[in-house]
Curated annotation (Swiss-Prot):
Residues 1-19 form the signal peptide. It comes from Hadronyche infensa. It comes from the Eukaryota. Domain repeats lie at residues 54-84, 93-124. Belongs to the psalmotoxin-1 family. Double-knot toxin subfamily. This is Pi-hexatoxin-Hi1c. The keyword Iron does not apply. This toxin potently and selectively inhibits ASIC1a, an isoform of the gene ASIC1. It incompletely inhibits ASIC1a activation in a pH-independent and slowly reversible manner. This toxin acts by binding to and stabilizing the closed state of the channel, thereby impeding the transition into a conducting state. In vivo, this toxin protects the brain from neuronal injury when administered up to 8 hours after stroke onset. GO terms for cellular component: extracellular region. Expressed by the venom gland.
Length: 128
């Protein structure tokens, strides 16, 4: 795809610089048909690549605020970390005794993520 774009742009540039009358009809056809298709395909592919590189929910978006996946926005946590969160979610902090696994800094005020013994997930508990 990128080769087709490069060749099309090179042809257009050469035609503009040299103004070859013999190839004028060829250039008109290229501009009318192929070039439009080539650029449309390139834009579509670029969008697909961008969508594949989006940042998932609760993952860091530091330095990439506009790259959260669809339905998510970059939100700055209390402790300075930025993560992608659902746009419609109003309360981002985790309430008392809720799991804070992979969300260590998201406990509500007066709570902290408490590591429990054994193989249990950590929970938000009152600060000690």
């Amino acid at each position: 795809m990128k080769l087709r774009i490069t060749l099309a742009l090179t042809s257009v540039l050469a035609f503009c610089v040299f103004g070859d009358k013999e190839n004028e009809n060829l250039m008109e056809n290229l501009l009318e048909d192929d070039l439009l298709d080539i650029f449309t395909d390139a834009i579509h592919m670029e969008r697909q690549e961008t969508n594949q590189e989006c940042i998932a929910k609760w993952k860091s978006c530091a330095g990439r605020k506009l790259d959260c996946c669809e339905g998510l926005e970059c939100w700055k946590r209390r402790w300075g970390h930025e993560v992608c969160v659902p746009i419609t979610q109003k309360i981002f902090c985790l309430e008392k005794w809720k799991s804070c696994f992979e969300r260590k800094y998201d406990c509500c005020e007066e709570l902290e993520c408490w590591e429990r013994r054994g193989n249990k997930h950590p929970v938000c508990a009152p600060k000690q």
